């Protein structure tokens, strides 16, 4: 009887200690079981897209949901890209998939080891827009308003061109390279 109680006690301690491990290292499967993919950021494409090295030495391209950052050739592109690198390059992150985008990139939310969501940090710092067309997160909307009011990051320019406007003009054959204040209808 005492032996069975002791074995049960040891088994309970073992289960409890394994369930308390974080998803930040050798117990990556704990996070994956909770709907997350754990990996290391190995490449920064721009301010809203990066490459994640996951289990099996596989690389997946991630497009952060809810935000849109300046595209290559747009003002503030390098600053936004470098800020994302500062936040997560060579860091282990947790990725929560929401699906695929039109370019077949993995779309979702990225979390740092402290639990911060990277897209929220990018918008708060004025390094990206809240992508309202595809995301209705009120916190992201408020973070964008705060960054705009404080003139942080890209909001230092009174009227920066949003990436979706840049893409629209590009599809129409209109170059926006080096243009900070072009507005729809002013082409």
Residue map of PLM features:
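Small beta-barrel nucleic-acid-binding modules, primarily SNase/OB-fold domains
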Residues: 2-187
């Amino acid at each position: 009887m005492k032996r069975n109680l002791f074995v049960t006690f040891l088994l309970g301690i073992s289960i409890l200690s394994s369930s308390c491990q974080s998803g930040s290292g050798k117990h990556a499967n704990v996070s994956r079981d909770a709907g997350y993919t754990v990996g290391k950021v190995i490449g920064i494409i721009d301010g809203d897209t990066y490459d994640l090295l996951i289990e099996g030495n596989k690389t997946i391209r991630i497009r952060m949901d809810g935000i849109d950052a300046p595209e290559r050739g747009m003002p503030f592109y390098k600053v936004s890209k470098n800020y994302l690198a500062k936040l997560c390059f060579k860091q282990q992150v947790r990725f929560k998939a929401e699906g695929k985008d039109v370019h077949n990139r993995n779309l979702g939310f990225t979390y740092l080891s402290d639990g911060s969501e990277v897209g929220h940090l990018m918008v708060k710092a004025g390094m990206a827009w809240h992508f309202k067309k595809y995301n209705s997160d009120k916190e992201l909307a408020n973070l964008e308003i705060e960054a705009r009011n404080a003139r942080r990051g890209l909001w230092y320019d009174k009227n920066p061109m949003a990436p979706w406007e840049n893409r629209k003009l590009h599809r129409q054959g209109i170059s926006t390279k080096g243009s900070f204040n072009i507005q729809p209808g002013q082409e």
